[in-house]
């Protein structure tokens, strides 16, 4: 869709045979650094809390989310049910997938969360951007 909009704004017809190449990636409609200002795009919890994070990949590519400082447990997944029960710091999320992960906030601090798919941590090719946020654990 981004490609089509760029073509339309330049007065040319989009080529439907060209591959769609996204260049903006977001968390709850925010891209880094605004993800750090939006309470819906970051995780803020107290030390000792257990929180559940809902993840929905509505995009056209797979993503690999890396949670610094924590392992998250996969509680639900509509496309990868064999991963339920996994406890990892890096979780693959397929296009069209919805999942819920559980995080136990067992250490205070500020920890990054980002996509390991390098294009997804850019805004129109500029780093840093895109799918980067934080987990804030207050003591």
Where are these regions (language model features)?
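Copper-binding active sites and cupredoxin-like electron-transfer domains
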Residues: 1-139
């Amino acid at each position: 869709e981004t490609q089509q909009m760029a073509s339309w704004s330049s007065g040319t017809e989009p080529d439907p045979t060209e591959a769609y190449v996204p260049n903006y990636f977001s968390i709850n409609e925010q891209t880094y650094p605004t993800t750090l200002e939006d309470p819906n795009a970051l995780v803020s919890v107290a030390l000792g809390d257990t929180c559940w994070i809902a993840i929905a990949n509505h995009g056209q590519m797979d993503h690999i989310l890396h949670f610094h400082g924590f392992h998250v447990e996969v509680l639900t997944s509509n496309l990868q049910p064999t991963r339920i029960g996994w406890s990892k710091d890096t979780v693959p999320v397929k296009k069209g997938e919805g999942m819920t992960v559980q995080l136990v906030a067992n250490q205070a601090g500020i920890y990054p969360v980002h996509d390991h798919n390098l294009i997804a941590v850019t805004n129109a090719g500029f780093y840093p951007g895109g799918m980067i946020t934080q987990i804030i654990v207050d003591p």
